Amino acid sequence: CHCIAVREKLLAMKETLGIPEFGGPWFCTTLRPGEVTVNMTRTAGNAIDNRNFTAAECRLREDVFKIARIFKENFEEFKNSYVTTVAVHAGIRETRRIKGVHTITAEEYVNAYKYPDSISRGAHPIDIHVAAGAEQSVTFLKKAAYVPYRALIAEDFSNLLVAGRCISADKTSFASLRVQASCMGVGQAAGVAAAQCIKAGVTVQKADIHNLIEELKKLGAII
C-alpha cells in the first residue's frame, strides 16, 4: 500500500534530516509476521553505462540504511525495526528500446485501440517517476490496453523479435508496459511467434498472425 501520511512526514523532514531521494513509500506484507517490504529508494542514472550504473547501485544501497535509520528514529511503528534483506540489484525502469515496425503511442494505449495483430494486453497505470524528487504522475487506464505484434519486430533487421522492456513504444505508453505482467504477456507472444516461424521456415516479419493469436488463446493468454 502507498502510505500518504508517512510520505507527507518524510517530505516535511527531508531537508532537516537529509533524507535521500525517494518515491512512495509503498509497503507490502510478507509471509513472515511483523515483516514488511519497503519500496522507496530512487536515483537517476544511465543504466547503459556500467560505471554509472554501478555508482547508482552503491548510492542506493547506502540510501537503504539511511532511510532505515530515519524510520527507526522517527516513526513509532518502526522503533524496533531492522533491515533483513536488500534487493539483489537495482530495478531499472527505462533504458533503450527498439524502433519497431509499429510504435505504440500514448493515444492508442490510453484509448485501448485494438490492433488487428494484438497479441497481449497491458493494465498497469501509466506511472511516470521524476528523475529527481519524490513526485510521480499516475494515470489509471479505463480499459486494458492492447499490444500489437509489430511493436516486437525491429524495423531495420530482417529477423529480430524482442520482448519485455525493449519493445517499440513511446515514453508514455512505456511507463505502463515496462512492468512484469506486461513483459510476461509480450514474452509469451514472442516465444510462440519465434517457434511458429522456425517451424514454418519464415522470418518473424512473415509470421501467420491468425495462427499466432489462436495458439496464444489455447495457452490461456489474455488477448
Regions found by a protein language model. Give the residues of each.
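Flavin (FAD/FMN)-binding glycine-rich loop and adjacent Rossmann-like elements that form
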Residues: 1-223
